[in-house]
Design a protein with these regions (language model features):
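Signal peptide processing junction and immediate N-terminal pro/mature segment
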Residues: 24-32
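A compositional/structural signature for long, glycine/proline-rich flexible linkers
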Residues: 32-459
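Generic low-complexity, intrinsically disordered sequence content enriched
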Residues: 13, 27-28, 45
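Acidic/proline-rich low-complexity IDRs
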Residues: 22-23, 40
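N-terminal secretory signal peptides and thylakoid transit peptides that target proteins
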Residues: 1-15
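Bacterial N-terminal signal peptides
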Residues: 15-21
Length: 459
């Protein structure tokens, strides 16, 4: 029987590490222990720095353009999406298809950026993230805000509210709920009223956005780009970023440990610090990364029937470094739980993995309770965490989909690769394994306690 290439690589890599250590003479046992300690420290360093590096890779790819478009814009300029995410969307994993995004990567090192939030009668908020993927603020009230590096000293115009961010790199994500393609003109009208400019330009009375730059080498998928880095490239990048995006004060203990690997602001990484077989250990660590993240992040998951979701401290991670990396890898830019929760399932009611080879019914007994302007949706993703290509370009069902309801008000959604006779309540999936996200925006407390979550049953 021929062994699959992926399994062969896993076994071969592991075997090589075992042989390399067991062949050492007895008198070098202490050195072997040091090697194991170096491996553990390497993992710790990677888990600590990954969110910062993936954030920068996302910034690099998203700003790699001379002029603003619907999916890229130079630094300090809006990326106004003109349509919902689809199967071609690769900028972030698990994109939502409920809202139109307006994003911007900001550099607030020289001066604050003025951000104008317009008046609207629908769900609209602006998530402000620092370079470490923490949510510094959520802007919902109409008005003018100055997004400012925390150590900036200066005067702001009257009526402008200061928003402090501890890092120079900032990512803003505005989400505007959409009721369907026919609602796009209304959403674009809201986008047109949004404002973004440097403080000096605001004080001068206007601003002509400068041209950006384009480099073909920066046309990459951020997650793939970061996971393909070797140790030196990864930690060189992290060290450089920490110069202008300083670690939190609470990170001091871990940084003292990582100094042994020359990881930290002002450090110059030397892969010789990893000892013998450093390249092999790096590859082995990456192979085991997903399993380790899933295992160590279980303490932060919350159960909701057959669904699980990431609870606090999501969005404000503190020293939960492994959890922070897990979220950055699987759902970069996730909201805090007061804004939204994202229950996920990849199994049916019997615990069997969901696959496009079967047909399922998702039964929603009652809509999840939400606060004013809240809403819900169910979205299907493939094994790669991207939306699944399908013949009708439908990637989710939601409370705005015009779904057929049963006499008791419940909803039955068909999950399948092949279309049913009536496609009104059909959510297409691909041939392979898939998983579902149930997004609940502005959840009421009852959604987490008294509400009966949906059930996925195999037909």
């Amino acid at each position: 029987m021929k062994m699959p290439r992926r399994d062969f690589l896993n076994v071969s890599t592991a075997a090589a590490v075992v042989c390399a250590t067991t062949l050492l003479p007895v008198e070098k046992a202490a050195a072997a222990q040091q090697t194991l300690a170096a491996q553990n420290l390497l993992e710790q360093a990677y888990l600590y720095a990954f969110p910062l590096v993936i954030m920068d890779a996302t910034r690099t790819a998203s700003t790699n353009t001379r002029t603003a478009t619907s999916n890229k814009a130079p630094i300090n300029q809006f990326i106004h999406a003109e349509k919902l995410a689809d199967a071609t969307t690769r900028a972030v994993v698990t994109p939502n298809v409920d809202t139109i995004y307006t994003q911007a990567f900001l550099d607030v090192g020289a001066e604050p950026m003025i951000y104008g939030v317009p008046q609207t009668d629908r769900f609209f908020n602006v998530q402000v993230l620092d370079a470490w993927t923490n949510t510094a603020a959520v802007l919902e009230t109409p008005g003018l805000y100055a997004i400012t590096r925390a150590d900036w000293q200066g005067e702001l115009p009257e009526g402008v509210q200061r928003i402090d961010v501890p890092t120079t790199m900032v990512w803003t994500i505005a989400r505007i709920v959409l009721s369907g393609q026919e609602d796009l003109p209304n959403v674009r009208a809201i986008q047109d009223k949004m404002q973004l400019m440097p403080l000096s330009a605001y004080q001068a009375g206007g601003w002509t956005a400068p041209a950006g730059s384009y480099d073909p080498a920066n046309d990459f998928v951020p997650v793939k780009h970061v996971l393909a880095m070797d140790a030196k490239e990864f930690f060189d990048t992290a060290n450089q970023l920490m110069e202008t995006n300083p670690p939190a004060a609470a990170d001091a203990p871990v940084l003292r440990e990582l100094a042994a690997l020359h990881v930290g602001p002002g450090e110059k990484f030397d892969d010789k610090a990893l000892g013998l077989f450093s390249g092999l250990r790096w590859k082995l660590m990456l192979l085991q990364l997903k399993k380790k993240l899933l295992s160590e992040s279980k303490g932060y998951t919350r159960q909701m029937g057959q669904w699980t979701y990431f609870g606090d401290p999501i969005g404000n991670f503190g020293t939960a470094y492994t959890y922070r990396t897990m979220v950055a890898l699987r759902g970069l830019g996730a909201n805090t739980t007061d804004v939204a929760i994202y229950p996920k399932t990849d199994v049916d009611s019997t615990g069997t993995v969901l696959t496009g080879k079967k047909t399922y019914t998702l039964h929603i007994e009652a809509d999840p309770p939400t606060l004013e302007k809240g809403f819900w949706s169910v979205t299907a993703y493939g094994e790669n965490d991207f939306l699944i290509e399908n013949p009708i370009d439908r990637y989710c069902v939601n409370d705005r989909s015009g779904l057929h309801r049963n006499p008791d008000g419940s909803i039955d959604i068909t999950l399948s690769k092949e279309a049913p006779a009536d496609t009104t309540n059909w959510l297409p999936v691909g041939e392979g394994d898939f998983h579902l996200f149930l997004r609940i925006y502005k959840p009421d407390a009852a959604a987490l306690t008294d509400w009966q979550p949906p059930v996925v049953r195999t037909n």
